[in-house]
């Protein structure tokens, strides 16, 4: 287990789940983001990486990537509204490039410097 994985595991769950075809944050997702934003406010040198996925039947690769980007940007916007500078948030839209786990998700990774 890497240092990053150890640090991320302290904030379980570290994944936002989305309804199929949707990029709207659920109340549960907002609660998770609230915990991460509180931690980022304390740890001013830490950064957040958002890795977004979208996997659905009959969804083309380009549409999956657009949907995953929309999900990542929803999470990013929520963090920014909670006082986290945009320069501390990295977004990766990976579309349907997942081999394990829930395909409709955003993984949250806290990166400590």
Which ranges hold each PLM region?
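Short glycine-rich, basic-tinged beta-strand/loop micro-motifs
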Residues: 44-58
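Broad hydrophobic/π-residue packing in well-ordered secondary structure
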Residues: 17-21, 39, 53, 63, ...
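Periplasmic peptidoglycan-binding/tethering modules of Gram-negative envelope proteins
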Residues: 1-47, 105-113
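Periplasmic OmpA-like peptidoglycan-binding domain that tethers envelope proteins to the cell wall
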Residues: 30, 54-113
């Amino acid at each position: 287990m890497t240092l990053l994985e150890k640090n991320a595991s302290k904030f379980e769950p570290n994944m936002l789940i989305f309804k199929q075809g949707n990029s709207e944050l659920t109340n549960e997702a907002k609660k998770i983001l609230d915990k991460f934003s509180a931690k980022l406010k304390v740890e001013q040198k830490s950064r957040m990486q958002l890795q977004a996925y979208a996997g659905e039947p009959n969804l083309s690769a380009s549409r999956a990537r657009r949907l995953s980007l929309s999900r990542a940007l929803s999470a990013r916007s929520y963090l920014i509204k909670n006082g986290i500078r945009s320069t501390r948030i990295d977004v990766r839209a990976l579309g349907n490039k997942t081999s394990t786990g829930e395909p409709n998700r955003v993984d949250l990774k806290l990166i400590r410097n």
